[in-house]
Amino acid sequence: MAKFDAHLKCSFCGKSQDQVRKLIAGPGVYICDECIDLCNEILDEELVDSQGNRGQAADSSRKAAPAAKKSGKPAPTLASIPKPQQIKSFLDEQVVGQEAAKKVMSVAVYNHYKRLAWQGDGQGETEQTATRLHKSNILLIGPTGCGKTLLAQTLAEMLDVPFAVADATTLTEAGYVGEDVENILLRLLQKADMDVDQAQRGIIYIDEIDKIARKSENPSITRDVSGEGVQQALLKMLEGTVANVPPQGGRKHPYQDCIQIDTSQILFICGGAFVGLDEVVQKRMGRNAIGFMPTDGRGRSRANRELQTTQVLRHLEPDDLVKYGLIPEFIGRMPVSAVLEPLDESALESILTEPRDALVKQFRTLLSMDNVQLQFEPAAIHAIAQEAHRRKTGARALRGIVEELMLDLMYDLPSQSTVKEFTITQAMVEQHTGGKVLPLPGTEQQKTA
């Protein structure tokens, strides 16, 4: 019996009795003091949430007040909010293509901040001012690398509001391993330099939202802690609630000091690739009912398939998202949706050269610091775009290709003080090799690789 006792371990965490302070025995099972503490925390948290004790939340807010700041910036006014056409023009400078999505987002963002300014005007109570304006969160649907995150980030830059990005795949229900949804608000608060007022007017972008779709359309009788459970946990935050945010992050504890954040003024933008969603739409409409693109015996090209997918998704209805795995309550809190198109070779070429922070401009600037003038042949730009399109990761592939291409050049050119000019050719791109450096003006012409 003594030999058996020496190998007792917790039935929940697996730690032996030598690794814990106490090991409590039951009929055939054992539990350690650490697991008991964890269970108590989960039960206490559920108890506080169910009671909805506002008094305790207010006390927590007062205790945490030193960690938060008072806003030094005034609330937006109607006159200070850029008009939808101005917003879209600013987006055009940074984001190539996606005209329909930019128009949808410009109107939605304008209405959102107009709503905040309307509520903060402090006008007398009239029938018009008594009308409550509800916010409209945005759902972006599009393939990877098409500009979903960049759109949201550019909007925040223009409006000069805090902006935070969260990954939905890291979130879990309270009480399980992973991040609580309140940690999203903590990121926004940190971006606002712990200024609660500023954070409450910010923008949160939740990426990979399609990855928390439940496994089937029917409600599950088992726990889906990283799918439907996360959707349920996000509902109140998306709609607007006063959330208790632990200032140090991590799991909430019923007795710890928290910062209160009102999410009713925060604009939530959710994005995802939603792979296979077009098939759900086609199934509803009938596969043969949509004849956007002609077919031949050899089948459709990739460009035609991408165009057809975009055309199909323009007929998207909320019920299609339910069938995909989003719960109806979640969809109802994302009333504005926009479908982004896959980037074709022409769009990728434009991304390389046109935006304010285009890759070509970035590398020209880097080499100009070494007194080298960098040029790209039009054929080289086209070859880079072709390779990026082949990799199927959208605009994200462009930087990887250019970094590979420029590695040797960025290594050698700073040490060659006689080189003042260099041209990237199509052959260099296709072979991923560096060419001969350009001689100084007046000497023999460059020989292309």
From Swiss-Prot:
Region (Disordered): 50-80
One Pfam family named in its UniProt record: AAA_2
Superkingdom to which the source organism belongs: Bacteria
Protein source organism: Parasynechococcus marenigrum (strain WH8102)
Listed name of the protein: ATP-dependent Clp protease ATP-binding subunit ClpX
Disulfide bonds: none
Bias-annotated ranges (Low complexity): 57-76
CDD domains in alphabetical order: RecA-like_ClpX
Gene3D superfamilies: 1.10.8.60, ClpX chaperone, C4-type zinc finger domain (6.20.220.10), P-loop containing nucleotide triphosphate hydrolases (3.40.50.300)
Keywords: ATP-binding, Chaperone, Metal-binding, Nucleotide-binding, Zinc
Single GO MF annotation: protein dimerization activity
Binding site for Zn(2+): C10, C13, C32, C35
Domain ClpX-type ZB: 1-51
NCBIfam families found in the cross-reference section: clpX (TIGR00382), PRK05342.1 (NF003745)
Binding site for ATP: P143, T144, G145, C146, G147, K148, T149, L150
HAMAP family linked: ClpX (MF_00175)
Role noted for this protein: ATP-dependent specificity component of the Clp protease. It directs the protease to specific substrates. Can perform chaperone functions in the absence of ClpP.
GO BP: cell division; proteolysis involved in protein catabolic process
SUPFAM superfamilies: Glucocorticoid receptor-like (DNA-binding domain) (SSF57716), P-loop containing nucleoside triphosphate hydrolases (SSF52540)
The protein's assembly and partners: Component of the ClpX-ClpP complex. Forms a hexameric ring that, in the presence of ATP, binds to fourteen ClpP subunits assembled into a disk-like structure with a central cavity, resembling the structure of eukaryotic proteasomes.
GO cellular component, as recorded: HslUV protease complex
Family (UniProt): Belongs to the ClpX chaperone family.
